[in-house]
Design a protein with these regions (language model features):
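Extreme N-terminal tail/first-helix region
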Residues: 1-16
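Glycine-rich oxoanion-binding loops at beta->alpha junctions
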Residues: 58-76, 123, 127-128
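Short helix-capping segments at alpha-helix termini
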Residues: 46-51, 78, 113-114
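Short, ordered loop/turn segments at secondary-structure junctions
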Residues: 29, 87-88, 122-127
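Structural motif
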Residues: 23, 56, 65, 80-82, ...
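Glycine-rich phosphate/diphosphate-binding loop of Rossmann-like nucleotide-binding domains
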Residues: 12-60
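C-terminal binding/interaction regions
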Residues: 96, 101-135
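Glycine-rich phosphate-binding loop
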Residues: 65-107, 111
Length: 135
């Protein structure tokens, strides 16, 4: 599992984001992790030229609701891309598998249906510590 250099990118290879409008849909579940991820996404967008006024952020209860939140954002806001941010941690039941599969397939479906890219930023780790390390 990668836990180092996760935030490295070559800024010279990224187009300037000044003229783009971004949406971020964040799961409220495991907020100590998803808040870090959202902050990192916003900081990165702004580092690439996006203005805070052009970044819309919505919250949904959990990762399973990310798909619905992204769909509604695409349909109601004029955005160029949306980032789905969530966290699912393995437990003792199959719930983890169902949530991960549903969210993944839902985001794939949104990317097929709409001309607005939906970026998958959902950590699916075995432990909370792994998620904290990666966030």
């Amino acid at each position: 599992m990668a836990t180092t250099n996760l935030s490295y990118y070559d800024k010279a290879t990224i187009p300037n984001a000044k003229s783009f409008r971004f949406g971020i849909v964040v799961s409220e579940w495991n907020p100590e992790i998803t808040t870090n991820l959202a902050k990192g996404a916003i900081d990165t967008l702004m580092d690439c030229g996006a203005s805070i006024e052009n970044i819309i952020s919505w919250e949904v209860p959990g990762s399973f609701e990310l798909v619905y939140g992204c769909k509604k954002m695409i349909e109601s806001q004029k955005i160029d891309a949306v980032i789905a941010i969530g966290n699912v941690i393995q437990g003792e039941t199959k719930h983890f598998d169902f949530v991960c599969k549903g969210v993944t397939q839902g985001i794939v479906d949104l990317n097929i249906k709409y001309d607005v890219p939906v970026i998958f930023c959902v950590l699916t780790d075995n432990t909370k510590q792994q998620s904290l390390d990666r966030s």
